[in-house]
Amino acid sequence: MFHVSFRYIFGIPPLILVLLPVTSSDCHIKDKDGKAFGSVLMISINQLDKMTGTDSDCPNNEPNFFKKHLCDDTKEAAFLNRAARKLRQFLKMNISEEFNDHLLRVSDGTQTLVNCTSKEEKTIKEQKKNDPCFLKRLLREIKTCWNKILKGSI
């Protein structure tokens, strides 16, 4: 009896509430049937992939972005949102107008489809803005994540 009173007097929540995982997400994917992805985003992702060339010159190390942000079962939309925001940095590479058009199409299209109501509008670090290897990897991860989402909804 004393133990129960002690817990509630000091505002300590029951252990079960502390151990419950946070499952709420502020992102909701709009187009799970894949029409917008297949007809718009995939085409632009493939074009960007061709424009960036081969990744044979890229080192095999994994950037911190991919260690911190994964496309796992509960965070696909959040990953895609962060990756789309990260893509905008590559506009500063100013490769060509066509490159920028495809980049904006993928970035804006992805953010529209994942429909995140994010409270955090942190400025993204610009350390990778001129790294074509990072861009290539980012595009590959975005493509893989979208494919994972679409396969799960079939």
Swiss-Prot record:
Disulfide bond sites: 27-145, 58-133, 71-116
Compartmental location: Secreted
Post-translational modification: Three disulfide bonds are present.
One GO BP: extrinsic apoptotic signaling pathway
First-listed, main subcellular location of the protein, grouped into a coarse class: secreted
Top-level taxon of the source organism: Eukaryota
One GO MF term attached to the UniProt entry: interleukin-7 receptor binding
UniProt cross-references to Pfam families, sorted A to Z: IL7 (PF01415)
PANTHER family: INTERLEUKIN-7 (PTHR48492:SF1)
Family, as annotated: Belongs to the IL-7/IL-9 family.
Identification of the protein by name: Interleukin-7
